[in-house]
């Protein structure tokens, strides 16, 4: 049976019975997505949703949606899990975990408030004029936010959409061909909750191909007030080329991440954390560990313990399906490393691959839970492989060691320093790829105080004409 993906415009599922369709092949299954028309583009670009919600109403709506996702019997959740397994090759455990995380994010009311508080300085600034310095300041939405989503990490799309919702922007969401399910399921759950809610009505979800005629998609891109682009270099270049010149583009492009193991006393705890950071999303995420740098004299013990923990993850979070080409790349990498006489171990049925090699000797990286481990003496042997704008996450075990290295790592380009085993949890208050995204989704408006309002440095009213007439400007210079 062919899976049909709906077209959602303004929170309404469109009748696409007369639309042409594009066939996507996912995990050897066919998915049909409607090809957007001129009429669709006109509906999207002309849509204007009045959002007078305050932050409390926004968070409460998201919480209500999250409670639906929390129910293991929610039909939308069940369908989503089946789609991830059938079409994206996720193991049932991975798919269930993804749905669990959607519910966790939506139901974490305190975290949603704190995201706004930390990024924008106050959770009230999106609702009220706040006194700041000699002004009153308010953060208004940019307007129409276009989200060009990637398919490797479904939760990145959820995060992108929630950031726009928290800042009261409309969402025009272009799904990835690899994952046309997540954004559609999320928007559909909004419809299930309240079809007439302003947040629901501000959601439009569709797909178009970058490699075909983009005349109609370009009309949609031209209406953007802000663009959020996720994906590889080609996706980021496409977004840059096709976005209006005047709009801000938040670029979440390709990154790499590493783990540092600093002579741990608890070898097992260190291995558990590193195994998690290798296995989560099968290394498809920017934050996934690909290289491990070990400092200390128990590398062999750690290597053996890490293989045990990778085998445990094979059971508790099984790897997703691999294509023929992916299996071939995995086997080729293994043979290349064996030929180079590196220490190599792999799990049954290509569950994982661990290779010990000297620092700086990087072979192919097929991902799919394959990692290189390098023995180094100190941090100076690691910093050459930390690249500005490339290295995202550095996970460190034991955690206490991070305080020794954070200044050095940051100065060499690392964007995020975490405890091993926490790579998929972006802590509230932290930056994302070197930025605070919500700040770039709003427009700050300043209402400045009048001339009679004295400043800290000048305790008289500001009478500029008088200063010029009497040539007394310098009298007031502090």
Curated annotation (Swiss-Prot):
Keywords: Luminescence, NADP, Oxidoreductase. Pfam families: LuxC. Pathway: Lipid metabolism; fatty acid reduction for biolumincescence. Its EC number is 1.2.1.50. GO terms for molecular function: acyl-CoA dehydrogenase activity; long-chain-fatty-acyl-CoA reductase activity. Signal peptide: none annotated. It catalyses: a long-chain fatty aldehyde + NADP(+) + CoA = a long-chain fatty acyl-CoA + NADPH + H(+). It comes from the Bacteria. GO terms for biological process: bioluminescence. LuxC is the fatty acid reductase enzyme responsible for synthesis of the aldehyde substrate for the luminescent reaction catalyzed by luciferase. Belongs to the LuxC family. This is Long-chain acyl-protein thioester reductase 1. It comes from Photobacterium leiognathi.
